[in-house]
From Swiss-Prot:
Transmembrane segments: none
Tissue expression notes: Expressed by the venom gland.
Keywords linked to the UniProt accession: Blood coagulation cascade inhibiting toxin, Calcium, Disulfide bond, Hemostasis impairing toxin, Hydrolase, Lipid degradation, Lipid metabolism, Metal-binding, Secreted, Toxin
Record GO biological process: lipid catabolic process
SUBUNIT field: Monomer.
Protein name as annotated: Acidic phospholipase A2 Drs-PLA2
Organism in which the protein naturally occurs: Daboia siamensis
Taxonomic classification: Eukaryota, Metazoa, Chordata, Craniata, Vertebrata
Length: 18
């Protein structure tokens, strides 16, 4: 699912952001 993939990327970016 594209949405799931996007969520995974967003989660990784969020972790890096923190």
């Amino acid at each position: 699912n594209l949405f799931q993939f996007a969520r995974m990327i967003n989660g990784k970016l969020g972790a890096f952001s923190v």
